A protein has these predicted regions:
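C-terminal secondary-structure termini that scaffold catalytic or DNA-interacting sites
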Residues: 1-2, 201, 237, 248-276, ...
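N-terminal DNA-binding module of tyrosine recombinases/phage integrases
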Residues: 15-21, 25-123, 281-291
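Active-site/catalytic core of tyrosine-dependent DNA strand-transfer enzymes
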Residues: 98, 190-194, 237, 245-248, ...
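Basic, Lys/Arg- and aromatic-enriched nucleic-acid-binding interface segment
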Residues: 134-147, 151-155, 166-230, 235-236, ...
Length: 384
């Protein structure tokens, strides 16, 4: 029986048209066992030799038969169902699905996976930035997608193509060659200390003081805040247990879910004033398990409803616009400025590590360093 030529055993010859050709074995047909021969062409023997070496290396690292089965669109669908969807929360999974079905597949989904280039992806990003909106642009709005949305699509593509490399469908990830848009940092704003009293007075007038007081002294995420139940409060130890958040289940229905990370599951110490407010709030609806039930339904507040109440409080108090999430920044900033150490603030916020907290609140920690330097300078001046 004749010996099969191994992948990469190529040969070079000069053709009648004057060009040089290198042939190599790209693999074997699974059904017939016959070799699959491919070639490279060049003007010189040296050029073909270089091309052949590269092609041979690629042939050894790619499952050619399987690679031919996929376009970008069919691979993304396979990756989504097998690797992404089972491990993602519903909002993220839905974001990926929409990105694939509405933005990527209609534009470049027919490109064979093995022929996809970084330039194809870069062109996609350009098109999405200029014409990405599915509905006609509203007055005053651009017709393209935002840089943050395009960056998210790039991240998804990069993950999907990394998996394709691992499964030997492509040699390397073409997304590595792209320059995705940079996301401009959102300007961090906080509620100035001198405005906190006005804010809380307006909250009290709307009957939601306990909820927003707790937010300002804990920095809870809105999904964590509305998911709190009376059983999460330990009156004796003056702590709040954070172990769940408002979210959506795999069917897309509102539901209670676990926080995103293990670090988000935590106990937060609160002052006695907060405990007293929460106890008084519970006495208004002693049989209701929710700490802050909706007055309309008696059920858990929808996170968006809390955001709307926050906007009304700002308006009532005559204060400038501030995102609800900025109340979390307000807590962290004021805690750091008042001497609470970074590690403690980080654990209260449910951050992955204190380093992330340091990077997020650099402006505050820089002020703390300057204050520490001044104190040390004063101390050294006294001892010298």
């Amino acid at each position: 029986m004749a010996k099969k030529r191994a992948n990469g055993e190529g040969n070079i010859r000069k053709r009648k048209d004057g060009r040089w050709e290198g042939r190599y074995t790209a693999g074997y047909d699974e059904k017939t066992g016959k070799r699959m021969i491919k070639n490279v062409l060049g003007k010189t023997q040296a050029e073909v030799k270089e091309k052949l070496a590269k092609a041979v290396a690629e042939a050894g690292s790619v499952d050619v038969r399987r690679a031919d089965e996929y376009t970008l669109g069919t691979w993304l669908q396979t990756w989504y169902e097998l690797y992404a969807k089972p491990h993602l929360r519903f909002p993220t999974a839905e974001y990926y699905r929409r990105g694939i079905e509405l933005h990527i597949t209609p534009r470049i989904g027919d490109i064979p996976l093995k022929k996809l280039t970084g330039r194809d992806l870069q062109g996609l990003y350009k098109d999405l930035r200029e014409h990405g909106r599915l509905r006609e642009a509203q007055k005053g709005k651009q017709p393209g997608l935002s840089d943050s949305t395009i960056r998210g699509i790039h991240t998804m593509l990069h993950n999907a193509l990394d998996r394709a490399v691992k499964e030997r469908l492509i040699v390397r990830n073409p997304a590595d060659d792209c320059v995705p848009p940079k996301i401009p940092k959102h300007e961090m704003k906080i509620l100035p200390p001198e405005q906190i009293k006005s804010y809380l007075t307006a909250a009290d007038q709307r009957g939601v003081l306990p909820m927003f007081y707790l937010e300002l002294i804990s920095g809870l995420r809105k999904g964590e805040l509305v998911a709190l139940q009376w059983s999460d409060l330990n009156i004796e130890n003056k702590t709040i247990s954070v172990s769940k958040q408002a979210g959506r289940n795999n069917a897309g229905e509102p539901d209670i879910t676990r926080p995103k990370t293990e670090n988000s599951i935590r106990k937060i110490s609160i002052p006695q004033d907060a405990v007293d407010l929460l106890v008084a709030e519970h006495q208004k609806h002693p049989s209701n398990p929710w700490m802050f039930p909706s007055p309309k339904t008696g059920e858990m507040y929808h996170p968006d409803s809390v955001v709307n109440i926050h906007k009304k409080i700002l308006k009532d108090a005559g204060l400038e616009h501030l995102r609800f999430h900025d109340l979390r920044h307000t807590f962290a900033t004021l805690a750091l400025q008042n001497g609470v150490d970074v590690k403690t603030v980080s654990s209260m916020l449910g951050h992955f590590d204190a380093g992330f907290t340091l990077r997020t609140y650099t402006h505050v920690t820089r002020q703390m360093q300057e204050s520490a330097a001044e104190k040390m300078g004063n101390f050294m001046a006294q001892v010298m």
